[in-house]
Design a protein with these regions (language model features):
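Non-transmembrane functional regions of envelope-associated proteins
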Residues: 1-179
Length: 179
């Protein structure tokens, strides 16, 4: 921890732009809601694509629809899929139009002896299938934490059901470099 704290920071790059949702974002009256409507995300993605971004990474898992439609009587809610909301449709459209967006997925680990890092990879959380189909690719956002809650390691990939999912950083660089 001390070695990292005393290490010089890498130089700034004009090639990488990070757009984050932070306290300042939430202080804006029109953005002071959570979750943000997916049309907000769609507009941000459209703006980034219009600005010429070579690749866009979204590091939050966009699972489930934002529809408030209730499961019809007589349907098994486990097997019923609600329709996409207009906000979800706007996001699908933005993903398709940009054509260069990498979405997040994560593999869930089962802790062994109270240590998540030594856990077995047991399940995965994926974006809504319509989002996954519209995106260029998926990447892993797994970031294991030590017992004290600090992330000191970075996984370059995770494997789930014999599929290797590269980390977001690896996937974004490979798309940017046409690898």
């Amino acid at each position: 921890d001390y070695r990292l704290a005393w290490s010089p920071s890498p130089g700034r790059s004009d090639e990488i732009v990070i757009v984050e949702m932070d306290e300042e974002s939430f202080s804006q009256p029109e953005l002071n809601i959570w979750p943000w409507p997916r049309r907000f995300h769609a507009q941000v993605l459209r703006n980034l694509a219009a600005a010429g971004a070579s690749v866009i990474g979204v590091d939050m898992i966009l699972a489930g629809t934002s529809s408030n439609v209730q499961c019809p009587p007589g349907q098994d809610p486990f097997f019923w899929t609600p329709p996409l909301s207009p906000d979800d449709e706007a996001l699908v459209s933005a993903l398709k139009d940009a054509g260069n967006i990498v979405l997040a997925m994560e593999v869930v680990q089962e802790e062994v002896g109270g240590d998540e890092a030594s856990g077995e990879l047991i399940a995965a959380n994926f974006p809504l299938p319509e989002f996954e189909e519209a995106a260029l690719a998926l990447s892993s956002v797994n970031l294991p934490k030590d017992l004290d809650g600090v992330a000191r390691r970075y996984l370059t990939s995770v494997t789930h059901q014999d599929v290797v999912w590269p980390s977001t950083a690896i996937r974004l660089v490979s798309v940017h470099q046409d690898l």
